[in-house]
């Protein structure tokens, strides 16, 4: 029997040492395993001509996918496969993605399908929820408004069921679109997506005191025009409410006290909490209110109500299972290996834009133009991306680069990590800043 190699002996010794300290401490000690296994560093972010690399905060076994033998040996907990079973990656090659999108669906005989539209105010958390339902981040997420600029499509395929998610921009008024010179897609896409919807998910951020007390007039008009489409209410970030009585008031207001054709039963001793600005749970007959009635602040035709907490994945699992059960017999629209209809370049541009929104102040990120100069596979199979960031002011250049290049380095590092998780390959990303003349 051949003697074990030096690398194999070191690996066994390291694994045993990690196993002895326990999985919680072990997570911070597993990073060096990549060198023991002979793996290359998974992400190198090169910014404005200066090399930048940061350690990947995950075990080396992640490079071979979830649920590896190394994780099981170390006692690491595995993700719930019932929430995100076999989540496909997105190809970094546009031609491969295009071929996959037109490939004949590999559906079973008893296939079922459901098209779901997510509607809500800007920054309500629609893209975050979409990513959670898909099991992989493919849509940009930011604390700033209008991160989603146009309709984006994601696909959930489990067993015989396929759910198609349409993540839309936050609904805005025509006046706001003109006043802020926003793209027309922000105004039109939520309405267009309703034309092919089987179910509408209305998302409300209950932590936002300015928007949580009522559905916007634009959203109510959209629901009224397509009233034949079933809808459900999802109240997001309920863990942010310190007093749960506020949650009851909001539920009564947003549903006009009616869910699935039945009036909500509230205790007579229930009183409004100061500062919520919600009406009494006692409401009029919803059928007697006209569409243009200024007193209408809710929608009395929701079939179900779901409450999501950022602290619990079980809430997302419950919503996902509901969507799967609502699917009707019909042919799939996509192959089971499809996760999103976006091109790799679109995903990359959106992710970088997300980081711009997160790291740049006020109006600056909205005035940055992105131009991809290089998109190719490197000699080691890594994805090489070079993108130019074009700005109209010298002051924007300084803000984007930051002291000693810190800001643009951070943007590239975070974008590279996200893209790695999307494409499941090494990513070499280079960003440069140029002043528009």
Curated annotation (Swiss-Prot):
Q: What is the name of this protein?
A: GTPase Era, mitochondrial
Q: Where is the transit peptide?
A: 1-43
Location of the protein in the cell: Mitochondrion matrix; Mitochondrion inner membrane
For the region G2, give the residue spans.
146-150
Region spans: G4: 236-239
Q: State the associated disorder.
A: Perrault syndrome 6: A form of Perrault syndrome, a sex-influenced disorder characterized by sensorineural deafness in both males and females, and ovarian dysgenesis in females. Affected females have primary amenorrhea, streak gonads, and infertility, whereas affected males show normal pubertal development and are fertile. PRLTS6 inheritance is autosomal recessive.
Annotated membrane topology is: Peripheral membrane protein
Locate the region Disordered. 271-290
